[in-house]
Amino acid sequence: MILPHDVPSQHGSVSAFAERLVADNSPRLYLLEDESRRDARDLVFQVGYRNEAERITALVGPCNLGQAVDASTDHALLVLLGEYAQHLGLIERLQAVPIDQRRGDYPPQSKLIEFLVGILAGLEHLEDLNQAPNPLVKDQAVITSWGQAGFAHYSGVSRTLSAAGDDTLSEVIEVLGTVSQPLIDAEVMALARQGRALVLDTDLTGRKVSSTSTTYPGSGFGYMDGEIAKGFQAAITSLTGGPCGRLLLSSQRYSGPAQSAECLRAAVQKMEQVLGLHPHRRTEQVQQRLQTLAANQDRLQASLDAEYARQRDLFDALQAARREKALRQAEVEQWTAESQARGWVERPHSKLAQARQRVVRAQKRQARAGRELRATAARLTRWEHTLAEGQVQQTQLLDWLAQLESENATLLHPLTCVLRVDAGFSTDDNLTWLIEMGYVVYTKAHNGQTTAKLCRQLPATVTWHRVGRNAEAVYLPHQRIAECPYDLEALLVRYHVPTGYLYTTLLYYGDRPPPPWLKDWFSGYNARQTIEAGIKEGKGVFRLRHPWVRSPIGMELQEQFSLFAANFVRWAAQWAKQLVRHANRALNDALTEVKTLVQDVAHCRARLVHNALGRALIFDEQSPYAGSTLCLSGQVAFQHVLPFFKSLNFLPPETS
């Protein structure tokens, strides 16, 4: 067991303790034989008492403790994560992933696990597995905690990632999803118990590569991080507001030219698949669209029928004009022949001249009927095409309605789902789709012309309300935005900038009115910066800024492992709080900060004490977390390492 220091104790200097050594034979002072610290300059001693062992025996009873192991690690967090991975069954599942590669010194699945451990360690490059100051491949405590016989050279890991195929990727995604699902469900359940909505975010981020590289298959030029660059795009979704703060739900990779709008639907569908739930579909809205479309189709069909009748009339008029023209032409020929036979001179009002005028009028009537007939034919073609499109749309809407009704039929406990997306996603079609999918939508206007139009419609006496440090807003209800068939609530925002004003428009759709306080609306939308923070964390903490390998499957594995790592560290931190037997303030703070855990605690020295009673992780006395202890399993008896010639706490012999 771990003996806490919460019983009565005395505090004194080493000199005072030395006097007790002379007066009392109970305490013992001995050197710590720690082979892993042979280069340490400080002389380290352990202090204890003879009766301490007696007290342990009395507490645990007679038992065989077996072979005790007192090891050290330079990667304390990774030992904890390895224990947690075994607790979740992650390692066992990853070891069953198929990889088409011959086994060398280590199985390919072991290298896949090593790859994940490197990501969890926040290594900058794959070669840091071997070349970092304290290389992971030499840390036996980490290797053991992850259930491996050893870690391979980084070049072997790279070859394994190159050998991985689509079946490897799909199986890894399934394993990570299976392990994550109960924990995601717990996050959702915690929100549901509180009656809170699920707040979801979607964003597109770039994965840059060298602009001159030709060895990244599928990469291309696109807009990334405010500039045109070469690489890939990743559509990320997240859930916020639960006990873990933020969980990343899915990541889908696209080529560099991909744009936000075309990635939205796949991202939302994948997000729903991961969550295992969705909001109540708004089938009544689809039914209303169908009714409106049917009425439009009926009106169009009536117009078509009338136009067909007009076409027939015009055709008859054209035929009549042709017959009249032929008749009048015959009259002209007759009068011409008679005039020539009698030697008449053609006068302006003669019979011949009048006959010629009747021919001209007949020609004009024929030409007019022909023009109207051609215009009618073009109009009929256009309306027939519109009618056909409407029929196709009706069929699609009927199928869409049937799908939504089917999804509603299997939905037992619908939750309110709020989805926040930026302007790049909010095209007319995407807004319509999200509304009918049942989401409460917070977004920005996709087209700047929308904001310009709303500004032109503002009355001169409008009152602006402050919503931010340099932002003011005005509420504009029930706005039709471009081709979206539904009314949206608009918040026209203007920012004070040195050159004047900068305008933008926030949009909202939900079953309830938007937040009554415009500042809450403004802040609620801008809180989507949490997913931007998650993207930044992925690039800066889990090193997605640079691809570790060039193979397409390897890059996709890095993407999926990094997304999982962001969640895994959060879950492990929650788990670790239950294992703490003693923690200073620094460790308590670190357990709430992923960046600190990965960049500091993951590279912090600690002792791993292990015997038949259990395992404990004790942070090094030189670390910021000195003396902090995590009981990984069971109960472990151990002694703290204390520096020589320093003050110390000790238990007097009579204390029990």
Model-assigned labels for residue ranges:
Residues 69-84:
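Structured, non-catalytic alpha/beta "coupling" segments that mediate domain-domain communication
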